[in-house]
Regions:
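Acidic, mature catalytic/reactive cores of soluble proteins
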Residues: 1-320
Length: 320
């Protein structure tokens, strides 16, 4: 396989078809590349679970990177029924990059190591479930002016790399809707199989879940909420864990997915004269990329596939 973040998870997707049990340890090692702010290291080290921040020390965040781990874990769960993997304790990656690549931790150096520590200097470990929640919730809150997830460095189409300030990927916002819904479903199955009504999560992550005061319609509010969380874990974290109801987590994930679904349907169904499709992107000027421009159709296949597969497109829209 390759040596990048997507390659790790997509290789596992293929290996799961042949040897699901053998992929478990591999996936847990991969989660050690996730930072507490939901971003991840992008260069793979020589040993399992070893990561390097970025090539040539150039900070870059791909907005789709948090999507692939859950997709892979979901297939593993379907293949094996081994929901105990969600309880597996895994460390987090730590380096100079903080606040989702927007700031630098000047107090960190290589002597501190590349594992997130708590205030007592102990390496902190969180469950695989905690890693998944952080990745997908942070993506939900990092939105552009049209309230879709920011494109940042690019999504899985690496050519879409010239819109770091105002670009948004509606296509992968659709993908994250699917993640949130399926993660909620997995949590409910986990609760039944493991007979666990609650899970332990870092107290910082508990605050990320408790967003009742956030107006989802307000992009600035969502970004401010995300920044407060990212700042709370940019150096050391408390190391304190709290019990959280599995049912409440699942309900919160569905609530976010429902809002995203309605928002995309309301704002991104474009076209004219009885022919419509979904816009999938905004460029660095904040303009819709797809639609009917001066009588010329602009449509990307990715946008249509992701809107259909995620369930954003309803039956009538899918027929169109």
């Amino acid at each position: 396989g390759g040596r990048g973040w997507r390659d790790l998870w997509q290789d596992c997707l293929a290996l799961l078809m042949m040897d699901p049990a053998g992929v478990r340890e591999m996936m847990c090692n991969h989660f050690a590349g996730v930072r507490m702010d939901g971003t991840n290291a992008t260069i793979i080290g020589a040993r399992p679970g070893e990561f390097i921040a970025d090539r040539n020390h150039i900070t870059r965040v791909w907005m789709d990177h948090a999507f692939w781990p859950f997709l892979t874990v979901r297939l593993y769960l379907d293949q094996t029924g081994d929901f105990s993997i969600l309880d597996e304790a895994v460390p987090y990656f730590k380096d100079r990059q903080i606040v989702r690549g927007q700031e630098k931790d000047d107090e960190w150096n290589e002597h501190h190591g590349t594992r997130q520590q708590d205030r007592n200097g102990k390496v902190y470990e969180g469950s695989v479930l905690e890693h998944l929640l952080i990745q997908n919730l942070c993506a939900f809150y990092e939105v552009g002016e049209h309230n879709h997830i920011r494109l940042r460095g690019a999504d899985w189409n690496d050519a879409l790399d010239l819109a770091p300030e105002h670009g948004e990927s509606v296509a992968f916002t659709c993908a994250y809707v699917w993640n949130l819904r399926m993660l909620a479903e997995c949590l409910e199955t986990y609760q039944k199989r493991m007979q666990e009504p609650s899970v332990l999560l870092a107290e910082e992550v508990c605050r990320l879940l408790a967003d009742q005061s956030v107006d989802y319609e307000n992009a600035a509010e969502k970004n401010a909420f995300l920044k407060r969380y990212a700042v709370s874990c940019m150096c050391e974290i408390s190391g304190v864990k709290k019990e959280v109801s599995v049912t409440k987590i699942a309900e919160g994930l569905r609530r976010r997915a429902d809002w995203m679904t309605e928002h995309i349907r309301r704002t991104e169904w474009v076209g004219a004269e009885g022919e419509h499709w979904y816009n999938g992107y905004y460029d660095n000027h904040g303009r819709q990329v797809e639609g009917n421009a001066d009588g010329n159709v602009r449509m990307m296949l990715t946008s249509q596939v992701f809107s259909i597969m995620s369930g954003i497109a309803d039956e009538q829209q899918t027929m169109q």
